[in-house]
């Protein structure tokens, strides 16, 4: 008994409803995992846009510009939570002011610094040190985080020996 294959609404792959778990979304079908991932992404995006709206209040942000920026950053591999934490790092932790004309263009420049900052805060050793002996250990967080990336040379070296 074969059934007609359906196409997943989110990933575009075809699958059989009898074999794989699925969810019916309006008049279409989707893999259960794809649907759960879509719901999670939607919740993350909503949280990010709510935070941007909170940053810009009482002004209304330029959603056309911000939407294209967020889509571009998502295509570059950044997550919505990563963008949210980058904005929190830049505006709350560093104390910078919001410029209504710039949108969220600071994200690609501060993304790695914010990631390093939050991984340092969430480090289990740091958390354990805070709990056990906060008097004897001076736990300090530097404001600037230096990230060193190794880069391969662009040009090949020339060998003059024959």
Map each language-model feature to its residues:
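Residues immediately within or flanking Cys/His clusters that coordinate Zn2+
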Residues: 5-8, 28
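Disulfide-bonded cysteines in secreted/extracellular proteins and peptides
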Residues: 8-11, 34
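Cys/His-rich microdomains that often coordinate metals
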Residues: 12-16, 38
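Canonical RING-type zinc finger of E3 ubiquitin-protein ligases
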Residues: 16-24
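Long, charged low-complexity interaction segments
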Residues: 23-78, 144-162
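Short, cationic/aromatic linear interface patches
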Residues: 85-143
